[in-house]
Amino acid sequence: MTFWDIILYTVSYFGLFTAVFFLLTLIENRNQIKNPRPPQKLPKVTVMVPACNEQDCLAKTVESLLSLDYPKELLQIIVIDDGSTDKTLRIARGFEKDGVLVLTKPNGGKGTALNLGLKHATGEFVVCLDADSVVEPDALKKMLGYFRRKAVMAVTPSLKCTEPKTIWQRIQVIEFLLGVYLRKVFAYLGSIHVTPGPFTVFRKELFDKHGGYDTTTCTEDIEISLRIQSLGYEIENAVDANVYAVAMPTFNTTRKQRVRWYKGFLENTQKYKHLLFSRKYGNLGLFVLPSAYLSVILATVMVSYSLYVMADKNYQRFMNLYNVNFDIWRLLEFKWDIFYLDQSPLMIIGLAALAIGIAMIVLAKRMSREKQSLTLNYVLFMFLYLPLYTFWWLNAIHARIKNKDVGWRGRKRKEAEIKYA
């Protein structure tokens, strides 16, 4: 057995073990998937919408909040304009007649906008909704029932993509659905480590007791979730409380977003490094966070090996053709036989992993009541995601080492994004 064989078996075993473990966790807890009933006496909820140069998306976002199936007298909506240079503030003020509170401030980043919103929040619970996202009318009620347990400080929704139109958006549809699946599994394991910006619900007392959003990180949603975990509180998930965000439509915008997410993960896991390998924090510290790091290493090794094998085989094919003066007609005489099929253990493991991957997507689709067709999206994801994932992580590691600013402060949407907003 060669060195590369050992690496491949290690990668394959880790991937298959993790996938089976997560699947069994979901099956074991299948009777708990249904959301608890919301309280009979509904609490007051504040929804904060931080917005910077979101003139093309903001109106739909606020309209979705005004359409929530929730008593209007118990719903406070705050739009915080973070120094926009377009028509965002004007659009926001157009909703003041509907009772929306509009605040404005110089540009300082999402965390500073949310902290301003917290100062004006009057609800027992607070929600952040990104200005490029829309929420289904029944989402809020589906989430509130989890707060019957005092230990629960946050409840996450199912974050999904709007209708995809580009290759990159189709890949993200599957990526987001995997996130839906994993977030529910992580909830059962007590290991949710990202509270998505679109429509995570928090107890306001969390911020009153332990401070507001961290304004020094590019991913405040990761920081606040790790802070909650480190304080010994819990984060739950309502798998069919659907929120839809506009997926990045181009290669470059997708890359920038993922680099920001991954760099933020590196920053915040370093900040909360006491969580890693700690028995005190259970599955999160002993398995989920270490596995996240290990998956990056193994993915990089796998992609590197695949590129090496591909280059080597293509070189061998070229030399074979060169030696027969590029006489390709003989290739047409090839007769296929079933014995040419690869029957190695690696192939069997690979097929098993593929089957489990499909099962994960199907389960996520059913649990979150997703209706769009996924076949083409999954094919694109299967062939393109792993090299893209590795590329994004290498970019993020480089940005972390160089301490590059990857935030989107004051950013304006490109024309390609506006087209799909």
Task: Give residue ranges: language-model regions.
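Catalytic donor-sugar/metal-binding loop of nucleotide-sugar-dependent glycosyltransferases
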Residues: 225-243
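Short, acidic, metal-binding catalytic loop of nucleotide-sugar glycosyltransferases
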Residues: 63-74
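Long helical/loop segments within the catalytic core of UDP-sugar-dependent glycosyltransferases
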Residues: 106, 111-113, 123-124, 137-217, ...
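A conserved acidic beta->alpha catalytic loop
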Residues: 81-89
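N-proximal low-complexity "stem/linker" segments adjacent to membrane-targeting elements
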Residues: 1-63
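Cell-envelope/extracellular polymer assembly enzymes that use nucleotide-activated donors
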Residues: 43-46, 76, 223
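Juxtamembrane C-terminal module of membrane proteins
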Residues: 24-43, 275-286, 316-421
